[in-house]
Amino acid sequence: MFDNWAKDPENVKYLSWQAHKDINDTYKILNEWIDKYKNKNCYKWCITLKDTNEVIGSIDVIEIIEIRSTCEIGYVISKKYWNKGIMTETLRAVMNYLFNTVGFNRIQLRHMTENPASGRVMVKCGMKYEGILRQYGVKNTGERCDTAIYSILKSDIL
């Protein structure tokens, strides 16, 4: 995690958290994640290369709105693996699991408008663009930014 994406400011520039300064930052967050697995509603996965099992990213449910049977997903992948279809394949698999095993009705994702590549992943996965949330996001610098929101319904993929 540290070597493949967390320490690289370029890799996390469209995320809400800063690049890890050293391996101890990564250990701290990994321990927090492990602790969250005690919660039955924790959905967090590593993204690995099929041939080597090298960890190159993560994808997880960052918010659950139970009354609406909705969840929101967040993801990150090493820039070394951008534009190779890996995130699209990963997102499709996670959406399938969340719809068919967990039972969500709606899945949504957001991205900073400065990062249209993330939106292209969402569209490739069948998500619908819903609009811009003005100054909804906060960059890892603390600056507010506009975010685009996409969603997909379970009925969209039947």
Go through the PLM ranges and name each one.
Residues K21-N24, W33-D35, L49, V76-S78:
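Juxtamembrane/interface motifs at transmembrane-helix termini
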Residues N31-W33, Y136-G137:
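A generic local structural motif
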Residues E32-C46:
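A short helix-loop-beta-strand connector motif used in the catalytic cores of GNAT acetyltransferases and
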